[in-house]
From Swiss-Prot:
Record PANTHER family: OS06G0237300 PROTEIN (PTHR24206)
Function as written in the Swiss-Prot or TrEMBL entry: Binds to actin filaments and promotes cross-linking into thick bundles. Has an actin-stabilizing activity. The actin regulatory activities are not regulated by pH and [Ca(2+)].
Name the record gives this protein: LIM domain-containing protein WLIM1
Pfam families, A to Z: LIM (PF00412)
GO molecular function: actin filament binding; metal ion binding; mRNA binding
């Protein structure tokens, strides 16, 4: 006897959902693996999801994008807690009326990928913003941190690769504080 599937289709992938992999939320059927946050693609559970117009979100991204509490207490860490004036300041353009402006979020862009940086994934170094995943060594892709990196001519390096590259070029004056490019280097160590 062959195993029979249901006639129900997954709302996310539109493929047949078998009983062993069936998950029902908001009267909609999903595969367990397809039950993911639209924003971060994280796996959801029935106890930790929200939906808006049939689109699934984890609680943090739902709150960030849709929740209007009238209070800034729920804002993500790093989000400015300064209210905007009711009318534009002199010389300032009024806010757009696009539908996208109705939703929360930010217009801050990552210098690594030029995509929007949300407060929960933001790394800020000297006023420059990065995603956590974009804040890495330019040469080797190594993980670096805001407290331990070298910025050289606008690029980020781990200490190991920066020293290696300078040795290959035969010019250590930048590391010792001499030379005309010394002002372009910033070494940060914890």
């Amino acid at each position: 006897m062959a195993f029979a599937g249901t006639t129900q289709k997954c709302m996310a992938c539109d493929k047949t959902v078998y009983l062993v992999d069936k998950l029902t939320a908001d009267n909609r059927v999903y595969h367990k693996a397809c039950f993911r946050c639209h924003h971060c693609k994280g796996t959801l559970k029935l106890s930790n999801y929200n939906s808006f117009e049939g689109v699934l979100y984890c609680r943090p991204h739902f709150d960030q994008n849709f929740k209007r509490t009238g209070s800034l207490e729920k804002s993500f860490e790093g989000t400015p807690k300064i209210g905007k004036p009711d009318r534009p300041l002199e010389g300032e353009r009024p806010a757009g009326t696009k539908v996208s402006n109705m939703f929360g979020g930010t217009r801050e862009k990552c210098v690594g990928c030029d995509k929007t940086v949300y407060p929960i994934e933001k790394v800020s170094v000297n006023g420059t913003l990065y995603h956590k995943s974009c804040f890495k060594c330019t040469h080797g892709g190594c993980t670096i941190s805001p407290s331990n990196y070298i910025a050289h001519e606008g690029k980020l390096y781990c200490k190991h690769h920066h020293i290696q590259l300078i040795k290959e070029k035969g010019n250590l004056s930048q590391l010792e504080g001499g030379g005309e490019n010394a002002a372009k280097d910033k070494v940060v160590a914890a």
